[in-house]
Amino acid sequence: MSGNAALGEAAVLAGCTCYFGYPITPQNELTEYMAKRMPEAGGIFIQSESEIAAINMVLGASVAGARAMTSSSSPGMSLKQEGISYLAADELPAVIVDMVRGGPGMGNISPAQSDYMQATRGGGHGDYKTIVLAPGSVQELTEIVPLAFDLADQYRNPVIILGDGMLGQMMEPVSFDDIKPPKVYQKDYVLTGALGRPSRMVRSLLFDTKEEEEHNWKLFRKYQRIEQNEVRYESYMLDDAEMVAIAYGIGARIVKGAIKRLRQDNLKIGMIRPITLWPFPSKVI
């Protein structure tokens, strides 16, 4: 199964009920798969008129309580950044897939890792963070998707799955047996109509400077909790390592092959593969 298709199926099994996207290579197979599977699963699929529209549809679905997802590739992710900043400021969960291609500019459709800084530093305006997960195989991709939705709901924060064109289009055996039914999170912020309760407001426009400062401190404390609790990484041949390589995603698979070859020459090399690019496993390194 291709990485893009496997990602789509994992999202359906993880309880995704809304998908909004706009075509761009090399993630088109995911959009095509969701166009078929979302109606079958009783969900909503909309091919939006633009990447900007797609991310704002995600915001609308999330504020109504849905598990919502969108996907794109590098130039399209640039267009989504304002909406991602709004999601972070509004504390709304969402899963955003970036199958990275070469850049800058329009670049090309070859796989790349050139969106790393954009994803891990908060690519839009304002000081915010997105949780960033970097799978290294199609099977791991299917395992990361449910985790992404759970982390998004748990922390009320957008989560980015950072893949690349190779991972999205390569074919590998996959199993979905370990995907559990989606967890149910209490979402007391969703806009469902004021049915015998005080009205709710989800907003990021804060004219009062003191109110905005307090809100940003609240976000900062949340980011600290994420850094304390959600660091994930893989250790590879570290027990006797004298040199350690750091690599993530598909690139880490290439590094593993190089390490095996170099160890035949008695070079003691190991690897740390960050699975969360943010929060980054800095203390381990």
For each feature predicted by the language model, list its residue ranges.
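Conformationally flexible catalytic loops at phosphate/diphosphate-handling active centers
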Residues: 156-235
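Glycine-rich beta-alpha junction loops
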Residues: 101-103, 163-170, 249-251
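Glycine-/acidic-rich phosphate or pyrophosphate-binding loops and their flanking alpha/beta elements
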Residues: 2-6, 220-243, 256
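Thiamine diphosphate
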Residues: 1-122, 129
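Short, solvent-exposed amphipathic alpha-helical segments in soluble enzyme
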Residues: 35-37, 85-88, 146-151, 176-179, ...
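Conserved thiamine diphosphate
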Residues: 110-164
